[in-house]
Amino acid sequence: MKEPLAAWLDRDSLDALWLRVLRRPIEPHEREETEARLAAGLSRTRLLRELVESAEFEHALRLDDAVAWAAAQRRAGERPRNVEAPPGTDERPVEIPWCLARYGGEQRVLDVGYAFAEPAYLVGLLDLGAPELVGVDLARADVPGLESVQADLRALPFGDGEFGVAFAISTLEHVGRDNAQYGLAREDDDGSLDAALRELRRVSARLLVTVPTGEGEALPEQAVLGPEEWVERFERAGFIVFEDELYELTDAGWRSVPQLSPGLRYGERGPGASAVLCAELRPRSLGERLRLAVRDLRHGNEVRRVTGSDAPK
């Protein structure tokens, strides 16, 4: 009994507390402030209560719930649509489970933009149980259980078809843009997005992707494209859109919609995107077209697309 109690009083207990409750390391200024409060009489139980009642914990809880739900859907063989999330949240509780649930047991998995990913999402990736999990990013980050590769999406250091599936969660919109907020270079190259998509088509058999969408001019740090514009980019890079779904942040929360509200702009309704496009992309080939035709023949009554000529009218 003495060892657990000693660990609770140990200075390192703050590291464990932040990791378990908030899913991130404690920042130096937080440690300094918290140690001062503990010295002034704050109990560790009171500290735990404060963390659990924080908005940051609520965000982590929503993501953990979403990742756990996606795992259950995946085990049941479901490809969920109509995912929902409450008002006041960003797009993560919708886009992350949408993609994770569609993992199909591939041996080699690539994640694009892992360095700044949500901890709950990284846990979800590790929980896929893929024999080989690789993360690629311009920035460097160490994630236990994931092979880290520092590289440019426009020139990936991988062989053709090396990965069974790639994940790109709210990442592609930043390619070729001003990424100084992430400690990276300032750029403004619209052609970079096409180059990154071509590389992802080259190295992976499937791409599970999410992108914020809406109207308005491009932001310094990201592209702003409407749903059909995104699909045009995907197809121009040599993909076919196997499945897609649009989500919009409404008064009731995040909901699946057949089309976006007119004039919808990034960031006007919540802390992140006002709408997000989730899609499964596959390299354009005769085999994929045949698989798509068979799928539509067998499941023609199920909605598969909300964009393109085969979307329901």
Please report, for each region that a protein language model flagged, where it lies by residue.
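A C-terminal cap/extension of S-adenosyl-L-methionine-dependent methyltransferases
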Residues: 128, 141-143, 228, 232, ...
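Class I SAM-dependent methyltransferase SAM/SAH-binding core
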Residues: 108-155
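A conserved beta-strand element that flanks and buttresses the S-adenosyl-L-methionine
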Residues: 167, 176
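Residues lining the SAM
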Residues: 169-172, 210
